[in-house]
Amino acid sequence: MNKIKSLFAAITLATCILAVIPAVAQSTSEAQSAASLAVVMEFLANTAPDKVEAAAERLAAPDATYVSLNFDNPELRKILPWTGTNKGPKAFSSLFLQVQDYWKIEDFTVSTKISSGEDVAIFGKFTYRSVAVDQVFTSPFSIHAKVRDGKMTYFQFMEDTYASASSFRQSGSWTVKTSANAAPFTVAAD
């Protein structure tokens, strides 16, 4: 009889432990998701020229990867020199320091924030005015970031690069052929 009671007690204890494990895992995952989102949002809240270097040092891992607009496009880099893949906290801060020389930020609105463990996705829109030619454009944006141990290890920022690069255009046109069956057409500055 004692063996049956001991066996029953062991089964009851095991059942309780197994019931708690998913709840603990879920709360750990939720806590990690919230912490990851908080790191990215803190960085975005501190991108002003007088704050961004300290924020990047504090919130980006030493070997973090920043992908801005594309992996590597030499032609676009001539227009937007921060584009491509760069490494370390300086990649995060130098981008925002350069942007202020090119555009006046008229609006930057986050509309959606999603986090799952170390992954964070941010969506929104911004309106910039080019400093040199006074062209205004509005673009959607998206961010995918990864956060480990309280530091961003990966940050990819995407926007409408046609609109952003066009905000500097003063003249010129392209003749474009988009598909084999389409007639060529011209895209020109307004």
Question: Each PLM stretch: what is its role?
Answer:
Residues I21-P62, T175-D190:
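Short, low-complexity N-terminal intrinsically disordered segments enriched in polar/charged residues
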Residues Q26-Q32, Q100-D190:
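A beta-strand edge to alpha-helix "cap/lid" segment located at domain peripheries
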Residues V40, A55-A56, A64, G88, ...:
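Hydrophobic pocket/interface hotspot
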Residues R58, P62-G117:
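A solvent-exposed, acidic/Ser-Thr-rich amphipathic alpha-helical stretch
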Residues M1-I11:
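Bacterial N-terminal signal peptides that target proteins for export
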Residues L37, S68, Q156:
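A cross-domain feature marking catalytic cores of carbohydrate-active enzymes
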Residues A10-V20:
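Bacterial N-terminal signal peptides
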